[in-house]
Amino acid sequence: MISQFFILSSKGDPLIYKDFRGDSGGRDVAELFYRKLTGLPGDESPVVMHHHGRHFIHIRHSGLYLVVTTSENVSPFSLLELLSRLATLLGDYCGSLGEGTISRNVALVYELLDEVLDYGYVQTTSTEMLRNFIQTEAVVSKPFSLFDLSSVGLFGAETQQSKVAPSSAASRPVLSSRSDQSQKNEVFLDVVERLSVLIASNGSLLKVDVQGEIRLKSFLPSGSEMRIGLTEEFCVGKSELRGYGPGIRVDEVSFHSSVNLDEFESHRILRLQPPQGELTVMRYQLSDDLPSPLPFRLFPSVQWDRGSGRLQVYLKLRCDLLSKSQALNVRLHLPLPRGVVSLSQELSSPEQKAELAEGALRWDLPRVQGGSQLSGLFQMDVPGPPGPPSHGLSTSASPLGLGPASLSFELPRHTCSGLQVRFLRLAFRPCGNANPHKWVRHLSHSDAYVIRI
């Protein structure tokens, strides 16, 4: 049983507020939650907080805070599951979950909350069941068009004919508009991996972890069967080995409850009949043993003149992907000593950009080709008490507050574990001659890629 549900933007602005029981302090509770959240040290806040007999449970999704409050002794895990399911429902009915889509679909969100929760008690979170009661149509930012070849979104892929699913393709609502009779039968399948790495200052690898998911978003009628074929050499655990080549191994794996595993052991095929909407077909984890080299290596060189406070940082970034692969939206973030205000730079290519932002050096590289090497020379003044006279720059100990460096990036058509989708086959038979469209994409991106200086 919950008392309130509200959605806040990343800046704390209330987008949605619903009081189910009238036993709380009104909308001020949302402001109280955000003040407590921002007042905590560090970036990671607890998902469960307590204040004057009221429990706050929240998740963060797409930059939004989804929060429930309760004064009862309710399992926090059940409320976290409810919030996760609400996030999926909002994505299904609004097309995607973000500040813009929520603002455009306030009436639809409140109608969903009225059907999902009655006086704070959960009634249903089934997309299929709710579609019989929801009357409000979603307001989308722009109509979907195959001629929209903008940047590829989360559920999009490059096909063999070099056609690209537009970014809005999978961001439309699962339920078609009543006036739209041309709803396309489409399936979007993404293999998404998050890479966490910690590299010591001498270049040795201290930690590596891959968290992977196979995500599905289906616009087919519910009950349509599909078969997903994974790499045949895929194995779970170190003791299992399949095929004659090097195995693609993960440490742990879990499946959605709707997945039929009858063909998994013999042929690495997943069978399922998904409902309309989004679900995670499979999750897996791999630690400490990647089958391929790390995508990036950083070679830093720091020279600091204590007398004048002159700091020179030379960064050489090497991309160890295959030459046909590339990394997109690469950003290096390097914390600097306190008080640095000036920056001079020499970059190896004009596409790069570097600037000071919030006490750190931010080096942006829009696109990095596999096998390439980029560099940047950065000079700055570190204010502080004068030191003994020095004859030029030296490679002495770095000033306090420098580093560690962190990288963020996206690797399209690449998985760090080596897992691939061999095929996606549908048993769906459309009424007309149009066959369902299938889009498959593989993507890796950084989660915490840290290099000590």
Swiss-Prot record:
This is AP-4 complex subunit mu-1. SUPFAM superfamilies: Second domain of Mu2 adaptin subunit (ap50) of ap2 adaptor, SNARE-like. GO terms for cellular component: AP-4 adaptor complex; clathrin adaptor complex; cytoplasmic vesicle; cytosol; early endosome; endosome lumen; extracellular exosome; trans-Golgi network. It is found in: Golgi apparatus, trans-Golgi network membrane; Early endosome. Signal peptide: none annotated. Ubiquitous. Highly expressed in testis and lowly expressed in brain and lung. It comes from Homo sapiens. Its main location: Golgi. One of its GO terms (biological process) is protein localization to basolateral plasma membrane. Component of the adaptor protein complex 4 (AP-4). Adaptor protein complexes are vesicle coat components involved both in vesicle formation and cargo selection. They control the vesicular transport of proteins in different trafficking pathways. AP-4 forms a non clathrin-associated coat on vesicles departing the trans-Golgi network (TGN) and may be involved in the targeting of proteins from the trans-Golgi network (TGN) to the endosomal-lysosomal system. The keyword Transport applies. Keywords: Endosome, Golgi apparatus, Hereditary spastic paraplegia, Membrane, Neurodegeneration, Protein transport, Transport. Pfam families: Adap_comp_sub (PF00928), Clat_adaptor_s (PF01217). Residues 184-452 form the MHD domain. InterPro entries: Adaptor_comp_med_subunit, AP2_Mu_C_sf, AP_mu_sigma_su, Clathrin_mu, Clathrin_mu_CS, Longin-like_dom_sf, MHD. The keyword Glycosyltransferase does not apply. Belongs to the adaptor complexes medium subunit family. The gene is AP4M1. It comes from the Eukaryota. Adaptor protein complex 4 (AP-4) is a heterotetramer composed of two large adaptins (epsilon-type subunit AP4E1 and beta-type subunit AP4B1), a medium adaptin (mu-type subunit AP4M1) and a small adaptin (sigma-type AP4S1). Interacts with tyrosine-based sorting signals on the cytoplasmic tail of cargo proteins such as APP, ATG9A, LAMP2 and NAGPA. Interacts with the C-terminal domain of GRID2. Interacts with GRIA1 and GRIA2; the interaction is indirect via CACNG3. It is linked to Spastic paraplegia 50, autosomal recessive: A form of spastic paraplegia, a neurodegenerative disorder characterized by a slow, gradual, progressive weakness and spasticity of the lower limbs. Rate of progression and the severity of symptoms are quite variable. Initial symptoms may include difficulty with balance, weakness and stiffness in the legs, muscle spasms, and dragging the toes when walking. In some forms of the disorder, bladder symptoms (such as incontinence) may appear, or the weakness and stiffness may spread to other parts of the body. It is a peripheral membrane protein. One of its GO terms (molecular function) is protein transmembrane transporter activity.
